[in-house]
Amino acid sequence: MSRICAICGKGPSFGNNVSHANNKTRTVWYPNLQKIKAVRNGSVKTIKVCTRCIRSGHVTKAL
């Protein structure tokens, strides 16, 4: 799964862009994912994690 956070499972959101003339076009909003090296199950892995999980300390970064 390419655009899903490995920690919280956050993925894309779907909806409409609505113009001033009330025209609607479908759009997708993707989470802000970053590739980081993290300690998972005692080993270092490169995973995609959203910035909210990084900031809130749900991930232990590998040094």
Swiss-Prot record:
Keywords linked to the UniProt accession: Ribonucleoprotein, Ribosomal protein
Domain of life: Bacteria
Pfam families reported for this sequence: Ribosomal_L28 (PF00830)
Species this chain originates from: Pelobacter propionicus (strain DSM 2379 / NBRC 103807 / OttBd1)
Name recorded for this polypeptide: Large ribosomal subunit protein bL28
One Gene Ontology term from the biological process aspect of the record: translation
Gene Ontology terms: cellular component: ribonucleoprotein complex; ribosome
Gene name linked to the record: rpmB
NCBIfam families per UniProt: L28 (TIGR00009)
GO molecular function, one term: structural constituent of ribosome
Family from the record: Belongs to the bacterial ribosomal protein bL28 family.
